[in-house]
A protein has these predicted regions:
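Transmembrane alpha-helical segments that form core, pore/gating elements
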Residues: 60, 116-117, 133-135, 139, ...
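C-terminal-most transmembrane helix of multi-pass membrane proteins
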Residues: 3-8, 13, 53, 212, ...
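Membrane-interface interhelical linkers
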Residues: 1-27, 57-81, 119-128, 146-150, ...
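Hydrophobic alpha-helical transmembrane segments of multi-pass membrane transport proteins
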Residues: 23-31, 35, 63, 80-95, ...
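Specific alpha-helical transmembrane segments that line the substrate/conduction pathway
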Residues: 47-57, 86, 94-124, 161, ...
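Hydrophobic transmembrane alpha-helices of multi-pass small-molecule transport proteins
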Residues: 111, 125-144, 161, 257-259, ...
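Juxtamembrane helix-loop-helix junctions in multi-pass membrane proteins
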Residues: 21-56, 167-191, 205, 209
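Hydrophobic/aromatic residues within transmembrane alpha-helices
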Residues: 39, 48, 52, 96, ...
Length: 301
């Protein structure tokens, strides 16, 4: 056996792969979200969400061909719940972006996974890590700037997106025994059925313009198909509490992507925030239970 094969099959690398998959998904999502903004003037929030999820579903169905795998009635119900919250999460977040700033929408939405992490915390160190992540997010995101005069409907949409995000983690964990490609393809298809009526009603035939479809396909691949597939791989092995804390890295990745791709400047406070979020994430990984197997079919997550 070659040295490369030994490294690829090492327990240490196998343990790291779910975390690498999650980080890779967050990087892909950060890049894709920046492209998605270009669709807003063309098809609006509902149309952007419909293109993103609908085209992702087509790509994932073509790649994974989920009908090849057996699907029990219980798993079908779980997939429906997973797809429902996935669709509502995407739609409500884009609806929030119509009237409130991106940073504030992200900050409000992150209350969902961080609350889930708090609920599943059992030790003092767990609560401290969640607190460190929250403090980092508060410094990184413009939570307090321009808070006066915020559109309450936009805030409500962002809060609902946060609730759906927490449920997405819970329901995704319950599908961790399934093939990752099967679960994400069926879930994304269900999400598309939820969103497409809103997108078609708001944008109409503009959704079918060749330039819009091409942009939408790029957004779908980078911001949905790839990251959600990687997240399903990660959810098979990462506990919900650890997953919720690790998601706080996403805005930090977005901020650094903006610095590299858009030449945006980060303040000293924002660099400190990124360091705090990174420390919380490292702590979450180090305190995660070892040797967790994927959940058994029908077992509660």
């Amino acid at each position: 056996m070659s040295s490369l094969s030994l490294h690829l099959n090492s327990p240490r690398l196998s343990a790291a792969l779910p975390y690498l998959a999650l980080v890779g998904g967050m990087v892909s999502l950060a890049v894709g979200t920046s492209f998605a903004k270009g669709l807003f003037p063309l098809v609006g929030a509902e149309g952007t969400a419909a293109l993103r999820v609908g085209l992702s579903a087509l790509v994932l169905m073509a790649i994974w061909r989920p009908w090849r795998f057996r699907l029990t009635r219980a798993d079908a119900g779980r997939v429906l719940l997973y797809g429902l919250v996935l669709g509502l999460m995407n739609l409500s977040f884009y609806m929030a972006l119509r009237t409130i700033p991106l940073g504030l929408a992200i900050a409000i939405e992150f209350a969902g996974p961080l609350t889930l992490a708090l609920i599943h915390s059992r030790k003092v160190v767990h609560f401290l890590l969640v607190g460190l992540a929250v403090s980092g997010l508060a410094m990184l995101l413009p939570i307090w700037s321009g808070i006066e005069g915020l559109d309450p409907v936009g805030v409500a949409y962002a809060a609902f997106a946060g609730l759906c995000w927490a449920l997405y983690i819970v329901f995704g964990k319950r599908l961790s025994h399934m093939h990752a490609g099967q679960s994400v393809a069926l879930g994304m298809s269900t999400a598309a059925l939820v969103i497409l009526p809103f997108g078609a009603s708001a944008a109409g035939l503009a959704l079918l313009a060749p330039a819009v479809l091409l942009m939408g396909l790029g957004v779908a691949l980078v911001s949905s198909a790839l990251p959600y597939s990687l997240e399903m791989i990660a959810l098979r092995h990462i506990p919900k509490r650890t997953f919720g804390v690790l998601l706080s890295v996403e805005p930090a990745i977005g901020a650094m992507a903006g610095m590299v791709l858009l030449h945006e400047q980060l303040s000293s406070l924002q660099w400190l925030a990124i360091g705090g979020i990174g420390a919380a994430s490292i702590g979450a990984v180090l305190t995660a239970p070892r040797g967790q197997a994927p959940a058994e079919p029908g077992a509660p997550a």
